[in-house]
A protein has these predicted regions:
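Low-complexity, intrinsically disordered, cysteine-poor segments enriched in small/polar
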Residues: 61-64, 68, 72, 90, ...
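Hydrophobic alpha-helical transmembrane segments of membrane transport/permease proteins
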Residues: 16-66, 159-180
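Membrane-water interface segments at the C-terminal ends of transmembrane alpha-helices
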Residues: 23-29, 59, 67-70, 134-164, ...
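Membrane-embedded alpha-helical segments of multi-pass transporters/permeases
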Residues: 16, 20, 24-29, 145, ...
Length: 312
């Protein structure tokens, strides 16, 4: 198991290195000059050139790349062109916001989909199975931003459980912050939860049809014991993998959710940085997102290998 974990860590590092090269290359060749964006189009060529030199934009590509990557390894994400402050300080507080949103959403997906998926598989064809099937179809058809608007209207304006747009910062009131983040997390999680319920139910029913399950049942093992001891262990593996895969989609959807609920997270900072060509901020956020996706993917594989040694 140790060798497998080390192999995954090495793979993670190589993937991030490749992503860093592509990201840096992309923002080096796209049209637009950060110096002009900061000084304005009326600035003289001399001032533009002086600022480019100050920002280190005139050096060879490969030198600038290795300098940037070296900074990443030291935790130095660079200096913001627009705000003239360290990128780590600019986006550090927003990272906790997005991490909280993603973790809450993943917990909702896992906490709801597993028990309901098991229940509907165990009572397949029953009344509640049909009810959950209809509900799943409805939620899978709803985009997260639309769910966000509906939840904002219902919980914020009808039930008045929170004030829409009145975001509470974690540094002021952490419990208030968590309370405000629950609704966005639900909006982000519900479509994925519906998918996970359907996937887990299907996998359990498929596993129950296999010879080992039929043999165990014929020997007198009751349905519940067979389900939890053998079938669920094998059926849940694809669901764990799927949860890891949807993490990337959650990050993309989270940017929209931020706008819907007025959350000052990484998504808003990313859009703002792109509009003013603040490339160090954009590159840092993209790398953080890439790290999150690759890390969760590697963690999912490690959990899969721990549960099922055949994967190693």
């Amino acid at each position: 198991m140790g060798k497998y974990v080390l192999k995954k860590i090495a793979s993670l590092a190589l993937t991030l290195l490749a992503v860093s090269f592509v990201v840096f290359l992309l923002f080096s060749v796209i049209p637009g000059d950060p110096a002009v964006s900061k000084l304005g189009t009326q600035a003289t060529p001399e001032k533009v050139e002086a600022l480019r030199e100050e920002l280190g934009l005139n050096g060879p590509f490969i030198v600038r790349y290795f300098k940037w990557v070296g900074g990443l390894f030291r935790g130095n994400l660079g200096q913001s062109y627009a705000y003239s402050m360290p990128v780590s300080k600019l986006i550090g507080s927003k990272l906790l916001i997005n991490a909280t949103l993603s973790i809450l959403a993943i917990l909702i997906v896992a906490g709801v989909s597993i028990p309901i998926g098991v229940y509907t598989a165990k009572h397949t064809g029953g009344f509640m199975d049909k009810v959950f099937t209809v509900i799943n179809q409805i939620f899978m058809a709803f985009p997260p931003f639309l769910l966000g608007l509906i939840l904002t209207f219902f919980f914020g304006m009808v039930l008045k459980l929170f004030s829409p747009g009145a975001y509470v910062g974690y540094e002021k009131n952490f419990l208030g912050f968590l309370g405000y983040m629950i609704c966005p997390a639900i909006a982000l999680a519900l479509p994925k939860t519906a998918m996970c319920i359907k996937l887990l139910r299907t996998n359990i029913l498929e596993e129950a049809k296999k010879d080992y399950a039929k043999t165990s049942y014929s020997k007198g093992n009751n349905t519940t014991g067979l389900l939890y001891k053998y079938v669920l262990k094998n059926a849940i593996m694809p669901t764990i993998t799927f949860v890891g895969m949807i993490f990337a989609d959650m990050i993309a959807s989270g940017i929209v959710i931020e706008q819907t609920f007025g959350i000052p997270g990484l998504g808003r900072s990313l859009l703002s940085a792109i509009s003013v060509r603040d490339y160090p901020v954009v590159e840092a956020i993209v790398m953080l997102i890439a790290f999150g996706i690759v890390f969760v993917s590697a963690l999912t594989d490690i959990i899969h290998a721990a549960v099922d040694p055949r994967v190693r």
